[in-house]
Amino acid sequence: MATDITPSSAPQCPDHIVFEHVTKEFRTRSGTVRALDDVSLAIKRGSISAVIGHSGAGKSTLVRLINGLETPTRGRVLVDGTDVSQLSDKAMRPLRADIGMIFQQFNLFGSRTIYDNVAYPLKLAHWKKADEKKRVTELLSFVGLTSKAWDHPDQLSGGQKQRVGIARALATKPSILLADESTSALDPETTADVLSCLLYTSDAADDS
């Protein structure tokens, strides 16, 4: 049976994510650091986009602007036509629920089972227990970790941990999936495996 990874919300805008002349600066003890300088871009729904740059080039900052963890110093970041920086904390919650995030260092809960790690965002979204169980079961099958459901993260390889991260990021059927250097800690073979999983995810769902 195919796993449903289709976004739960319908498209609202052809350009899913838009940066309009975005500059982001940070103040440090040694002065102001400009992480992004007048960045403009548009990402269409259902597309795959990659940001390439050396360490410290502002890649992670760009990602954090999309999900509202950072706000622009100047310019606007729009998601489906909405200026993210103008949203209140309450209005930001449904937006963040529609954005999945895969981290470089996995960010799994070591004291929880693989099942519970994947179920975590569903609990935050107040899914019914039966729906939660069905969804987690589907996702663990999708990433090939059904037999690891009751293991803990320290029992998994790096590639398996990142597969858990992918499953967790897809749990609430987000329309946006952000991956912040999600393969940089993996060996080449495992990297190819994880990227194949992500490409299949994009092909199977109308997400960005």
Regions found by a protein language model. Give the residues of each.
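Pre-NBD coupling/linker segments of ABC/ABC-like ATPases
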Residues: 2-12
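A short, hydrophobic C-terminal helix/tail in secreted or cell-surface proteins
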Residues: 203-207
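ABC family nucleotide-binding domain
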Residues: 13-202
